C-alpha cells in the first residue's frame, strides 16, 4: 500500500511537490491496529495537499463485497505539525472543505479557514471523499454499493494510519459525517480525543428513511427510463423540502397562485433551480449508495468512550432532536449538548455561521498547540 500526494493545484495556501511515502503493509484487517506511527512528511508541510492511499485488496465491506475504486483520497489543509482535526459533512460534501482557486468556496468555508473557528493557522485539517468515488474520470456503477458508516470510518482510518496520525485532536462530523464520526468512535475508541457530532444520531428516524426511500425510487425510475437528469433533479427537489423548515419557506416565498394551471409557483421555480444545479454534483448510483448508507447507519452509543459534544437543532426534521437526546442519554462520556432552534432546520450547520462558530470556538479552545 502506498501513500501519495496528488493533484498539486494552486490554492490560497502554499502547496508542495508530489511525493510518495514508504510502502505500508497490506491488510484491511489491520486498519487502526495500535502500533508506533511515524508522522508522514506531508504533515510537516504547510498548506493544502491531496493525499491518496491505496485500498488493500482484502478490504471487505460490512455487508460483503469489495470496492471497485482503488484508492481513498483526502485533503490536508492548514498548519504543519499542528493538532489534526478531521472534518466530514453531508453526502454532498467532499474533501474540499476549504476554498481553493480552482474549486471556489469549500463546502464549509464558513467554519474552516484562516482565523475561522477551525483555524488553519492553529490546526491541521483533514477531509476526505466518501466512497463510492465520483468525478469526471470515474465511470458510474451499474448497481448501487451497499456501504455502511463503519466502512467509511475504516477508509478514513487508512488515511490516518498512513499519515502516521497518532491522535486525532477532534473529529467534527455533520449530518452523514456525524454518523461516520460516531462509527469511528465505536470502531477506534482511542484514536480521537473528542468527537463533535452535529445533526446526527445513532440511528436514522423512520420518517426520514421514508422520505429518502421516495427519493431512491425516483432515482431508480430515472435509471429504468433513461431520464437520469430529470430523476436527479426531482429527487433533489424533494430532498430540499426536508432540509429546511416550514417557517423558512413561509418567509421566503409568496403563496400567490400563477395565472394558469400548469404554471410554476415561485417556490417550485426555486426547487427546480436547485434540482438542475445538483445534476453535476452526483450520479444516481452514488446517490442511491449514500442514501442507503444513511438508513443503514447503526451504532451502539455505549461503545463510544471518547468525549462527545452534540449539536442539535430543535427544528431539524431529518434528525429530530428527540433522537439526539436519546443518544445523549446513552453516551458514557457526554461533554456537552447544544440545542438550538433555526429556520434552516437540518441545514443549520451550513447556514448559522455565527452560532456554529461560537460553539466550535468554545469546544476547540483547549486543544494544546
Curated annotation (Swiss-Prot):
Pfam families assigned: Abhydrolase_1
Residues annotated for substrate binding in this entry: 236, 347
Enzyme class: transferase
Domain of life of the organism encoding this protein: Bacteria
Site (Important for substrate specificity): residue numbering on this chain: 176
Compartments where found: Cytoplasm
Keywords, ordered alphabetically: Acyltransferase, Amino-acid biosynthesis, Cytoplasm, Methionine biosynthesis, Transferase
Function: Transfers a succinyl group from succinyl-CoA to L-homoserine, forming succinyl-L-homoserine.
Name of the protein this chain belongs to: Homoserine O-succinyltransferase
GO CC terms of this entry: cytoplasm
This protein's record includes keyword Amino-acid biosynthesis: yes
Region feature (Important for substrate specificity): 90-93
GO molecular function, one term: homoserine O-succinyltransferase activity
Xref: Gene3D superfamilies: alpha/beta hydrolase
Active-site annotation: 175, 316, 346
Primary localization: cytoplasm
Ranges where the AB hydrolase-1 domain occurs: 107-353
Site (Important for acyl-CoA specificity): 212
EC number(s) reported in the record: 2.3.1.46
Catalyzed reaction equations: L-homoserine + succinyl-CoA = O-succinyl-L-homoserine + CoA
Quaternary structure note: Homodimer.
Family under the similarity heading: Belongs to the AB hydrolase superfamily. MetX family.
